[in-house]
From Swiss-Prot:
Family, similarity comment: Belongs to the glucagon family.
One Pfam family matching this protein: Hormone_2
Protein name in the entry: Vasoactive intestinal peptide
Residues modified as Alanine amide: 28
Cellular component GO terms held in the UniProt record: extracellular region; neuron projection
UniProt-listed InterPro entries: Glucagon_GIP_secretin_VIP, VIP/GHRH-like
UniProt keyword annotations, A-Z: Amidation, Hormone, Secreted
Length: 28
């Protein structure tokens, strides 16, 4: 169970990082 929670949080963080990179590329 803890493994699934970790994966869920990790994927959420990955999405946030991807969004930040996308916004930075737009602003660059």
């Amino acid at each position: 169970h803890s493994d699934a929670v970790f994966t869920d949080n990790y994927s959420r963080i990955r999405k946030q990082m991807a969004v930040k990179k996308y916004i930075n590329s737009l602003l660059a």
